[in-house]
Design a protein with these regions (language model features):
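Conserved alpha/beta-hydrolase
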Residues: 72-96
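Alpha/beta-hydrolase fold nucleophile elbow
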Residues: 124-136
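Short glycine-enriched nucleophile-adjacent loop
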Residues: 139-150
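Active-site nucleophile loop of the alpha/beta-hydrolase fold
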Residues: 157-161
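An N-terminal hydrophobic leader/cap segment in hydrolases
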Residues: 1-32, 39-43
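Alpha/beta-hydrolase active-site loop
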Residues: 101-122
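Active-site glycine-rich loops that stabilize anionic/oxyanionic intermediates
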Residues: 50, 58-61
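Serine-hydrolase catalytic-loop signature spanning alpha/beta hydrolases and amidase-signature enzymes
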Residues: 60-68, 80
Length: 161
């Protein structure tokens, strides 16, 4: 059964328990993209994982927003793979002002996810069922990717797509 973080001392539990645990497990990577630049990812792997989840964030967000969800997934024996979409977080961007998000075409997001899946996720999760957890704009990216590549994921949860 999943133990939800308490509201009464949420900030303290995140700072004293969750963040140190995630920091000890997080592998950050910058994957080169075929179109230039890099896609930033946070990878959390554990030897006793029984499943894998790919997390796709929403517009103007980044993988960092889903650290609490990452904690829950890790406690449920998932390996976690979370990216910063292009123009977001630490990934390639065309505009230096980090308060502005820009992408030339929505298909860029789809291609980036395909490259992340083929270059990072699929080789590391051949033996695990994969789940997609995608929020808002990430849900749109995930939904279109599911249509094009149903073999990527056994299940999907799209929140506010």
């Amino acid at each position: 059964m999943i133990s939800i973080l308490p509201e009464s001392n949420y900030a303290a539990v995140m700072a004293e328990t969750v963040e140190p645990y995630l920091d000890s497990r997080r592998q950050e990577m910058d994957m080169p993209l075929s179109t230039g630049g890099t896609l930033h990812a946070e990878v959390y792997e554990q030897p006793d994982a029984t499943r894998a989840v790919v997390i796709l964030h929403g517009y103007t967000e980044s993988a960092e927003k889903f650290r609490e969800m990452t904690w829950y997934f890790l406690n449920e024996k998932f390996n976690v793979y979370a990216i910063d979409h292009r123009g977001h977080g630490k990934s390639v961007r065309k505009i230096s002002d980090t308060s502005i998000t820009h992408v030339d075409a929505f298909s860029d997001y789809l291609r980036d996810l395909e490259e992340f899946m083929s270059g990072v996720v699929l080789p590391r999760t051949e033996h695990l069922p994969r789940v997609l957890y995608a929020h808002s704009m990430g849900g749109a990216i995930g939904g279109m990717t599911l249509m094009n590549h149903p073999e990527y994921f056994a299940r999907a949860a799209l929140t506010a797509p």
